[in-house]
């Protein structure tokens, strides 16, 4: 007779795999400018020291073709005369040479500790990002020419940062982002917008090459379940600006937002468990209702 067949031991069910929480990008808006003057090397150094892995800044070209960092197209809001007095008359970057810009102080308005701070060049910022091992979020401003966009891309390449750079610009500057992906189909690009609608999605899709990450970078008031679904159906992730409240940040990430441009929130601020969708949407809607049209409309 055949020996009895030993029954196979029962298969232990594998424990359920916990879904990984997405890593949220916290982007230092114009550097960490709660500690140092915005868009200056001290602000970027403060951001890196605080733990930010992503630094945002705005690029303009001078009259003699030097790429410099400043949010506005004029320097009046952030610069002062060398003696600390306010600048009289509008000073537009595109009508000034780099040497002329060096005559102004970009730190003294924030306090004596920053006396003598000069406007940074794009080249030195990219070099800093490389040395600090952080990712630059490069906002293209002032309707640059294709040649100017290519100049910036060349500077990024020379710094060995082509694979790290993120390029962002508003919908009305879509052509500039198209210039970026035409020159480098693998470039990561984000389309800035105050809203999130079908037209925004259609514009962003023109930047998809099949080889790159394209995302929507929208004002936080544009986020709700429907707009997030619209983006997801197009294969677009969503990042937001400018969020300085932890509760709002938690609500936005619970709705699927993967990046937050901020003035104050440190990268360590995350939520262990996402909120219920209806709770998250209610919080976002409350903040949107209270939102007032300020300079935060434009990062």
Regions found by a protein language model. Name each.
Residues 1-299:
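Phosphate-group recognition and catalysis centered on beta-loop-alpha active-site segments
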């Amino acid at each position: 007779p055949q020996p009895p067949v030993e029954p196979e031991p029962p298969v232990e069910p594998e424990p359920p795999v916990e879904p990984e929480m997405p890593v949220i990008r916290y982007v230092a808006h114009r550097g960490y400018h709660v500690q140092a003057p915005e868009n200056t090397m001290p602000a970027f150094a403060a951001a890196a020291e605080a733990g930010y892995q992503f630094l945002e800044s705005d690029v303009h070209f001078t009259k003699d073709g030097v790429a410099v960092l400043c949010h506005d197209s004029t320097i009046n809001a952030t610069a002062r005369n060398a003696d600390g007095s306010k600048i009289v008359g509008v000073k537009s970057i595109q009508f000034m040479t780099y040497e002329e810009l060096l005559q102004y102080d970009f730190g003294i308005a924030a306090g004596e500790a920053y006396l003598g701070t000069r406007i940074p060049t794009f080249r030195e910022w990219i070099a800093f990002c490389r040395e600090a091992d952080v990712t630059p979020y490069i906002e293209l401003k002032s309707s640059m020419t294709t040649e100017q966009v290519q100049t910036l891309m060349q500077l990024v390449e020379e710094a060995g940062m082509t694979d790290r750079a993120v390029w962002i610009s508003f919908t009305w500057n879509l052509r500039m982002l198209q210039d970026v992906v035409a020159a480098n189909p693998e470039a990561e690009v984000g389309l800035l917008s105050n809203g999130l609608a079908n037209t925004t999605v259609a514009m962003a899709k023109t930047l998809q090459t099949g080889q790159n990450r394209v995302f929507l970078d929208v004002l936080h008031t544009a986020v709700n379940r429907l707009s997030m679904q619209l983006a997801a159906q197009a294969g677009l992730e969503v990042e937001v600006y400018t969020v300085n409240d932890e509760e709002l940040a938690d609500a936005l990430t619970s709705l699927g937002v993967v990046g937050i441009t901020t003035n104050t929130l440190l990268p360590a601020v995350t939520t262990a468990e996402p909120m219920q969708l209806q709770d998250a949407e209610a919080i976002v809607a409350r903040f949107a209702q209270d939102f007032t049209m300020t300079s935060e409309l434009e990062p």
